[in-house]
Amino acid sequence: MIRNFLNFLWNNTSLRFLIINTIIFAMDKVRCAHLLLKHTGSRNPVNRNTGMAVTRTKEEAVSEMKGYLEMLRKSDNLDQEFRRLATAKSECSSARKGGDLGFFDRNTMQKPFTEASFKLEVNEISDLVETDSGVHLIYRIA
């Protein structure tokens, strides 16, 4: 009976296309949230949420982010705490969505961000990741 059902699915061209694309989509994309702190050396040192120029140094951004990372690693509810912190502190427009960037593939983000994101397991947080945009903490959602 299961074999007949699987044969039906495979022999139906539309369903086969849907199944294959679903598998490819799931394998080649991740969904992450992030917390971004910019610094004076960032590509665009302006807080996307306030419109204010960022005045912190890279060293200050790293130090501040290390504090957030330590706090998150001690959290009993990483998902909730990460989203709360990203909403309050991130300097990316994604802060309005708890830092959620949605699904993205290997060609969407800057290379260090992509590499860190695809190495993470679901519900895992990265170490500090530096890109031209600033210093990030990345949380893999899916």
UniProtKB/Swiss-Prot annotation:
Kindly list the cysteine pairs connected by disulfide bridges.
none
Primary localization class, coarse: secreted
Where is each PpiC domain found? 34-142
- Write the signal peptide boundaries: 1-32
Which molecular function term from Gene Ontology is one that the record holds?
A: peptidyl-prolyl cis-trans isomerase activity
- One matching Pfam family: Rotamase
InterPro entries in UniProt: PPIase_dom_sf, PPIase_Pin1, PPIase_PpiC
Q: What is the effect of changing residue 92 to A?
A: Loss of peptidyl-prolyl cis/trans isomerase activity
EC number, as in UniProt: 5.2.1.8
| Subunit annotation | Interacts with host FBXW7; leading to FBXW7 autoubiquitination and subsequent degradation.
What's its job?
Peptidyl-prolyl cis/trans isomerase (PPIase) that acts as a key virulence factor by promoting host leukocyte transformation. Binds to and isomerizes specific phosphorylated Ser/Thr-Pro (pSer/Thr-Pro) motifs in a subset of proteins, resulting in conformational changes in the proteins. Promotes host leukocyte transformation by binding to phosphorylated host FBXW7, disrupting dimerization and promoting FBXW7 autoubiquitination and subsequent degradation. Degradation of host FBXW7, leads to stabilization of JUN, which promotes cell transformation.
Q: Any idea what this protein is called?
A: Peptidyl-prolyl cis-trans isomerase NIMA-interacting 1
Question: Can you name the source organism?
Answer: Theileria annulata
